[in-house]
Amino acid sequence: MKIAILGGTGDQGFGLALRLAKNNKIIIGSRKKEKAEEAAKKAKEILKQRGIEADIIGLENKDAAKEGDVVILSLPYEYTLSTIKQLKEELKGKIVVSIGVPLATAIGDKPTRLLFPPDGSVAEMVQNVLKESKVVSAFQNVCHAVLEDLDNPVDCDILVCGNDEEAKKVVIDLANQIDGVRAIDCGNLEKSRIIEAITPLLIGLNIKYKSKGTGIRITNLEI
């Protein structure tokens, strides 16, 4: 499967690229092709040191969106709306994974505080713009440092929600490829309001306890 990660040069997107490259072709997207190519080269070198010959390329966001079977939006909240409005045609009919969180850093405030999007959540905002795409919300509660630590499994459940059952299953299967992850179907896209709100809490715990990256596990749940 071809996975395009728009904004894949950032920490979260880069970590996902490393974790998903074992079984998929990864297309790292950026506003500048040169920056995307540099990130792709770096990711390939990291994985090659571990004996993995990964298929990773770098493209501008528009071309990456066009190429991907599944497109992951790894974009700061403040740039998400403007970016997806420019890519509506490229994203038409595709599975689009929203991993964004409306952190107050978008307005110069603390990352432990949350903004409240008019649509209810980042994922719902994306779906309301990309009406012909299948938007799935996932990966908000896993820290980039944990994703990039390839020496250890990812000790975190991935909470997934969306309105299209088939698209949601694709994303759940994708998340379950990551060593240590258990992906959980949490229901329709509205649940992203709750899932996104967990992230600033986790960031606060990381700061308070000097953790490299807290995660979340749902206990007493057999799936």
UniProtKB/Swiss-Prot annotation:
Any one of the GO CC terms: plasma membrane
Key word NADP present: yes
Keyword field: NADP, Oxidoreductase
Top-rank taxon, per record: Archaea
Gene3D superfamilies listed in its UniProt record: NAD(P)-binding Rossmann-like Domain
Keyword Lyase recorded: no
Pfam families for this protein: F420_oxidored
Enzyme class, broadest EC rank: oxidoreductase
Biological process annotations from GO: copper ion import; NADPH regeneration
GO molecular function, one term: oxidoreductase activity, acting on NAD(P)H
SUPFAM superfamilies: NAD(P)-binding Rossmann-fold domains
EC annotation from Swiss-Prot or TrEMBL: 1.5.1.40
Reactions it catalyzes: reduced coenzyme F420-(gamma-L-Glu)(n) + NADP(+) = oxidized coenzyme F420-(gamma-L-Glu)(n) + NADPH + 2 H(+)
Binding site for NADP(+): 9-12, 30-31, 35, 75, 101
NCBIfam families from the UniProt entry: npdG
Similarity comment: Belongs to the F420-dependent NADP reductase family.
Functional description taken from the UniProt entry: Catalyzes the reduction of NADP(+) with F420H(2) via hydride transfer, and the reverse reaction, i.e. the reduction of F420 with NADPH. Probably functions in the regeneration of NADPH required in biosynthetic reactions.
The protein's name in its UniProt record: F420-dependent NADP reductase
Organism: Methanocaldococcus jannaschii (strain ATCC 43067 / DSM 2661 / JAL-1 / JCM 10045 / NBRC 100440)
